[in-house]
């Protein structure tokens, strides 16, 4: 079995449990206005919220504060909070309750978080607990960490609803709580760190595909899994763009994290329509498989979307694809540790730390392609200049 095939098989097993950042930055809310992300008569996604959509559309146009060379330190429209009551003299013990490492995005993230902690001499100890993508285990982990003398608690929740009460109990101990990646429905954490969100991701990629395919162009929407809120939000935003630009979405199909199925879907649509003018994907898992399906049909690869996975970036460069890669940046794992150091030093932090959401284009592709890294290494880690790179991230 090839290295990529083995990796893909592993991912297919776990993606149903833990998508890379598998919830959006805010807990899902349902819009009741009757407006929706689609043509008249198309049912509205239960995850769609007009206000959240409008906010993210605006945020992606706002220049973040801070140095663009360190995007993990940048922030969009921050409201700073005082942290002086959390000042801790001497060496620190940080604790991290992780939802799990069930996919390569999270593996890259955890490696990056640990490397960031090593950069701060004030951090004497870092305790990491893996919930194995199980709510019950993470709830128990959080209770156990409250007995470990943690000076700050970082949490990447497994799910929103189940973990909210456990995080509220952690906040009540007086230890500062930092939540990142996935949100909870309480504002008790000192800060909540996340990129802009799924609507921005979907709109960025759909605008590119609509521009390249043109009005009336035939576009196949390749979905990963149903009923995952961030993926639903990505598709909802894309549907808005496609409807507005007059794109003909000839099909919306789920590959269910199955690469052969993704190839079969493409082959079937090529037989039906003869030519596809673009493929929009709500996640980059199947982007390489989609390109390979066009190769098998002896057709040029049309404009398509991907993410910052090395296999896709390498194919993009090699074949000079017409592509774009919106991202869910891994560098937020760095921000979580940095926020903890700020809080324990008494430095203000944003109540909601919104990070910029990198878009990889042909012009910036070479900045993110890292030769020699594993196929599913995610290059938005901001880790390329950290001590131990590339060895610590290569899995060797």
What are the residue ranges of the model-derived segments?
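Structural motif
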Residues: 78-81, 126-149, 252-272, 287-289
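Hinge/cleft segment of the Venus flytrap/periplasmic-binding protein
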Residues: 31-92, 333-396
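Hydrophobic alpha-helical
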Residues: 155-170, 238, 250, 255-315
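Bacterial lipoprotein signal-peptidase II cleavage site
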Residues: 21-31
């Amino acid at each position: 079995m090839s290295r990529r095939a083995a990796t893909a098989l592993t991912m297919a097993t776990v993606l149903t449990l833990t998508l890379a950042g598998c919830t959006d930055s805010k807990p899902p809310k349902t819009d009741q206005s009757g407006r929706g992300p689609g043509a008249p008569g198309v049912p509205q996604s239960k995850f769609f919220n007009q206000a959240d959509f409008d906010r993210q559309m605006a945020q992606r146009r706002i220049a973040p504060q801070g140095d663009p060379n360190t995007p993990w330190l940048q922030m969009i429209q921050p409201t700073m909070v005082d942290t002086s009551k959390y000042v801790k003299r001497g060496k620190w013990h940080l604790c991290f309750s992780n939802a799990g490492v069930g996919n390569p995005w999270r593996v890259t993230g955890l490696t990056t978080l640990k490397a960031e902690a090593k950069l701060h001499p004030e951090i004497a100890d870092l305790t990491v607990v893996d919930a194995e993508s199980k709510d019950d285990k993470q709830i128990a982990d959080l209770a156990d960490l409250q007995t470990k003398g943690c000076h700050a608690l970082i949490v990447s929740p497994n799910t929103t609803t189940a973990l909210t009460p456990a995080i509220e109990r952690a906040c009540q101990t007086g230890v500062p709580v930092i939540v990142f990646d996935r949100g909870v429905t309480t504002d008790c954490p000192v800060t909540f760190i996340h990129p802009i969100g799924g609507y921005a991701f979907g709109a960025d990629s759909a605008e590119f595909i609509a521009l390249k395919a043109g009005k009336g162009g035939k576009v196949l929407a390749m979905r990963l899994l149903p009923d995952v809120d961030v993926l639903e939000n990505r598709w909802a935003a894309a549907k808005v763009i496609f409807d507005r630009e007059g794109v003909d979405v000839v099909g919306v199909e789920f590959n269910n994290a199955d690469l052969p199925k993704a190839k079969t879907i493409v082959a079937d649509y090529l037989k039906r329509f003869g030519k596809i003018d673009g493929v929009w994907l709500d996640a980059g898992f199947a982007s390489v498989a989609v390109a390979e399906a066009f190769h098998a049909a002896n057709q040029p690869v049309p404009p398509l979307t991907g993410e910052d996975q090395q296999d896709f970036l390498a194919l993009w460069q090699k074949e000079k694809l017409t592509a774009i890669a919106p991202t869910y940046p891994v560098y937020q794992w760095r921000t979580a540790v940095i926020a903890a150091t700020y809080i324990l030093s008494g430095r203000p932090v944003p109540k909601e730390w919104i990070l910029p959401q990198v878009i990889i284009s042909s012009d910036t592709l070479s900045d993110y392609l890292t030769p020699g890294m594993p196929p599913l290494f995610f290059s938005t880690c901001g880790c390329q200049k950290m001590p131990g790179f590339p060895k610590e991230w290569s899995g060797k």
